[in-house]
């Protein structure tokens, strides 16, 4: 074989090896959230966000993933949907969530994959049995030394697809309408004085979230845009299509913030490129009077 042929084979092998390695190389991304609505008692509190596991495994029994979370020692763990993968067995995700719930308060919202899974009710029942707070268009007070912040969560619109089918609306229209109903329920009579975190799987509705008394939104779903290239938000994301806007990182508007997790697992045959699986840690900072 000519040298050129060997070179091509070597490049393909190296690319394939990198693509596989990058799907298993867990990274931790840190964000600091500063607000004058964060009580002094919550200054320095940390939370971990995990999203889009899709029943993936990172080492034996997911111990490498769990070890990282344990080392971060957060005040709570937020799961922002697609922990299970469609109609695949939920047992990998169940095992991860059970172990997390032994160590930390865990809050969960569903994603579109739970919305189409025949196993979701079993998964939900198992989470609740292990004291996970499943948020379905509702909110929860988190208290520390008598001071409270709010965690709200909405069920993914995929759960109500059949309710909207007869109206024959475009997918993006009925999904936004369904999500608006969920947000209305989750934030009904919510005082804007509370620092409020919203768990909602879908980042493409960031403009909608801004209309509510919410300070920080945590989402996933976009898988980091699948292929991450410089100066882009990736090449493709579900719900956003080609050249999406919100696939990773922190986005700010009107005094509010959206954090989008790149997620953990993968649901396509295409590899994640320059897009390592991500664990997010956020630290709250109380902004005192000047």
Task: List each model region and its residues.
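Membrane-embedded segments
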Residues: 41, 45-140
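Binuclear metal-dependent hydrolase catalytic cores centered on His/Asp/Glu-rich metal-binding motifs
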Residues: 129-131, 144-196, 206, 272
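Short, Asp-centered acidic motifs that coordinate Mg2+ and/or phosphate
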Residues: 75-76, 107, 132-133, 149, ...
